[in-house]
Amino acid sequence: MLDNVLRIATRQSPLALWQAHYVKDKLMASHPGLVVELVPMVTRGDVILDTPLAKVGGKGLFVKELEVALLENRADIAVHSMKDVPVEFPQGLGLVTICEREDPRDAFVSNNYDNLDALPAGSIVGTSSLRRQCQLAERRPDLIIRSLRGNVGTRLSKLDNGEYDAIILAVAGLKRLGLESRIRAALPPEISLPAVGQGAVGIECRLDDTRTRELLAALNHHETALRVTAERAMNTRLEGGCQVPIGSYAELIDGEIWLRALVGAPDGSQIIRGERRGAPQDAEQMGISLAEELLNNGAREILAEVYNGDAPA
């Protein structure tokens, strides 16, 4: 590989390509003379669209092929939406940079209704996320929640075709694709606690690739990294994938991290919530201790039931 070339492995969805170009532009601005090439790929998550994610292996489906490209030295970095990044990495790879976070909230999108509370009973709401589903069902048990897969454009088309009365998407994705006008309401964390890392872009590379790690250092956003570290530590302790309804959101307020989290039964019948406040340097430990609290307060049983197997120890 030429010293002045860096290769980015990326999925081919419009949002994934936006993220890859975002990282490419940042790298070239920080390192004049660097040539950045995109290596587009198709992942299993892009191909299996007729089955809910939870049933086909979860969000790791979107990153595995990219990681193989890194391990086989066909690419130098992989760019991910942080909410799609599993808690564990293949040996030799790791998350080395987290870019500045976009708006982390969920978006209520509808052609006929202004907000969630305006939906009549029996309305059909589309979401592919058990996390969104459980919070929706708790707040509005009178709604019908149906699975919704595909990229952002596909999901909006299904709404426009009348298959749904409303759908829930990420604010960040809509903004990045220039579709902010489709957002009827951004749902505050009190109504829909975001996914771990939602709105942040993460960069994975080979851990022994010193040159690439040095190039990426300029893109790391310290505050976002602290917040996402707390969220991911909690998720790791819960052994959370996207197959279970887990929400986690950290804010940095007056120099202190405020971490909120929940674990819920998919039907919204039971949601265990908790929060922690503490010093930024304790971000990881805060996440772990909050996870322990949730497990002890009933999350262990919910997770065991959802996984149909062993609960986290």
From Swiss-Prot:
PROSITE patterns recorded:
PORPHOBILINOGEN_DEAM (PS00533)
| Gene Ontology molecular function: any one | hydroxymethylbilane synthase activity
Q: At which residues is S-(dipyrrolylmethanemethyl)cysteine found?
A: 242
Q: What is its EC number?
A: 2.5.1.61
Alphabetized UniProt keyword annotations? Porphyrin biosynthesis, Transferase
Listed InterPro entries: HemC, Porphobilin_deaminase_cofac_BS, Porphobilin_deaminase_N, Porphobilinogen_deaminase_C, Porphobilinogen_deaminase_C_sf
Pathway listed for it is: Porphyrin-containing compound metabolism; protoporphyrin-IX biosynthesis; coproporphyrinogen-III from 5-aminolevulinate: step 2/4
One GO cellular component, as annotated: cytoplasm
Q: What else is known?
A: The porphobilinogen subunits are added to the dipyrromethane group.
Purpose? Tetrapolymerization of the monopyrrole PBG into the hydroxymethylbilane pre-uroporphyrinogen in several discrete steps.
Record's protein name: Porphobilinogen deaminase
